[in-house]
Amino acid sequence: MLVLANTMHAGERTQTPQLFRKMSRAIRLMAGMQLLPAEFARVLNPPRRTQAPIVFYLGCNALRTPHLLFNAMYVLDALGTDYEVVGGPGSCCGIVQSKWEGELGRGERMINATLTRFEGLSPEKVLSWCPSCNLHIGETLAGFHSTSFEFGHFTTYLADHLDELRLKFVRPLPLKAVLHAHVGLADLGRNVARVLAAIPGLQLVDTVAESGYTCGGSGCARAPELMKKEHAQLIDRVRETGAGVLVTFYHNCHAAFVRAENEGGLRVLNYTDLLVEALGAAPHEDVFKRLRLIDDWKMIVDEAEPYLRANGIEFDRPLLEKILPDVFRMAEFTGGLDCFASRT
């Protein structure tokens, strides 16, 4: 019902015209700044297999912080999961068209195409990463669209396989941590807390649940003053407990907090980083955090340029330096990034 209400409001007067086009280009740019060509192809190209018992559905915006997704794939591999990856704007769940642009027909066509792509792999389960996709597709399947597969969240799959996962944790992590979660979709936050509690040596001293179901434009950023207050309270709580680690949940949450490391006294890690470490491996490099901690847009372009060229992404350097602040803060969700709106 919430999505329907937002759709009706957006249909009357959208403040985010051409959002999907702008978002798609921003996502491709950000993924291209951080990934090697083989990785870039894996998360953006259509699946190569014709059948897979499990589909790991990335959604769109998670590709802005792609190291989380590759960490998640490492965990699936460690569990021996036979899966295929589907993601990127070409497999959008349709929430942007419906909820943000008010284009219900386009949103329906998009979600139907994505569900058809899932069905083409004949999966038993589809595991979603993105909370917005989880909500939108979940609501679509609840009485409106029948499928042959079970749709659920990646963290639920981890919780269901926790006994197996626990046996594979070979590296103790002597850390004190506070988990950042949300009031909305609280069961998913509890899944993460359960899995983290199984890591040897890790002391989860608190879970702080903020308003909304995620950080970012679809979540708590819609109330900026409340978001600012709750984010500050979370950082204070990490310091009060003496925890050295703030554990983030979703991609937007991770993006919102990584710069807190510049203040000193804490590390910002995603829960998937900790899982990979506990499994005895090195997490995928968090290039997003490395770039944000530089906090100099010319230097960020210097760092990103080899990745962009390797991935075949053409760019105008002065323009890129100018727009990167808006790209990183997802300004298209507040009507910005008009340079990405043209059809060419």
Language-model segments: residues:
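A polyampholytic, Gly/Pro-enriched intrinsically disordered region
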Residues: 104-112, 168-185, 222-233, 285-305
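A short, acidic, amphipathic alpha-helical segment used as a generic capping/interface helix at domain edges
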Residues: 226-244, 253
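Iron-sulfur-cluster electron-transfer modules
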Residues: 1-134, 140-141, 292-306, 312-344
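Short glycine-rich phosphate-binding loop at a beta-alpha junction
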Residues: 124-130, 177, 244-249
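Short, flexible loop segments at boundaries between secondary-structure elements
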Residues: 146-173, 207-217, 262-300
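Short Gly/Thr/Asp-enriched flexible loops that form oxyanion-binding sites at enzyme active sites
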Residues: 136-142, 255-265
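Redox- and metal-dependent alpha/beta enzyme cores, enriched for Fe-S-associated oxidoreductases
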Residues: 86-88, 163-168, 174-226, 310-314, ...
